[in-house]
Amino acid sequence: MKDIPVKIQLDQVTFQLKEHHNFDWLLKLGTVFAVFDQQDSGNLSFGVEKNGHKKFIKYAGAQTLAYKGTMGDAIEKLKNSVSLYEELKHDSLIKLIEHFPVHTGYVLIFDWFDGECLHSHWSFPPPEKYKNPNSPFYKFKHLSVMERIQSLNSIFSFHTFVEKKNYVAIDFYDGSILYNFHTNETNICDIDLYSKKPYVNKMGRLWGSSRFMSPEEFELNAMIDARTNVFNMGAMAFALLGGGKDRSFTNWEASKELYEIAFRAVNDNRIKRYASVETFYKAWLNVANAKKI
């Protein structure tokens, strides 16, 4: 027999969980104005406002409908992510303010970034994501090529920094990206599974969206490294400037020179890719800065 979801109302928002949960701790932080309850990570996130200041709250400890794992694992992953947000602090990453345990769960509090998620599957599930003029992804794809390249530059700059810090990006996809259409700023909002190198694939199929994943992210005992992240960056370039998994030049909206850089990055043969995100980004910038966009 299927469990009947429990409806929860907090201030301006309503959502469902597998069972009742106490959110008194959250209400003390301010007025809840947004909820993000469709993630399969086990996390439940909120927008909270107090005295005109907005914060983004990420919480593990409640039985969300989409999560298939154990609550202990969700809490542990969220706790472990704290050091990532501290060590990888960057202008293009949401800013962690504080973190603490509550009841049987754990909370991370970030500064609120006023952006829209490029993979808002809860509001615009495909094909709406690609066709609805109100979809953040649709709006992003209708920005100028230059604006999209600047957004990609923020993403590549951050991952060059991640690489220098001896980390590897895991589970990076368009759902990790927030874009502010008023200021044209880009922020990364989810690095919870990024890991220190060396990192070996012990799962077979790693976490992530197949649209952005390299062959080695499906291969048991494969090394996940800088060349893997080069593939991820190239795949993101095709998602935001081209035809996504259709990596033909026909659907590419920027220059042939930039296309060739992105196409080399997503070579299935890892040896033929750029050796690092840094070398990929330098080649990309050399072309973009020469106005060969």
Mark where each language-model region is.
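Conserved activation segment of eukaryotic-like protein kinases, specifically the C-terminal portion
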Residues: K202-E217
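Conserved end of the kinase activation segment
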Residues: E216-R227
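Activation segment signature within eukaryotic-like protein kinase domains
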Residues: S151-L152
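Catalytic-loop of the protein kinase fold
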Residues: H159, E163-N180
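Juxta-kinase regulatory segment immediately upstream of eukaryotic protein kinase catalytic domains
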Residues: M1-A34
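ATP-binding glycine-rich loop module of kinase domains
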Residues: F33-V35, S41-L84
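Conserved HxN/HPN-centered segment at the entrance to the catalytic loop
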Residues: L88-H99
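Conserved short submotifs of the Hanks-type protein kinase catalytic core
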Residues: H103-C117, H121, P125
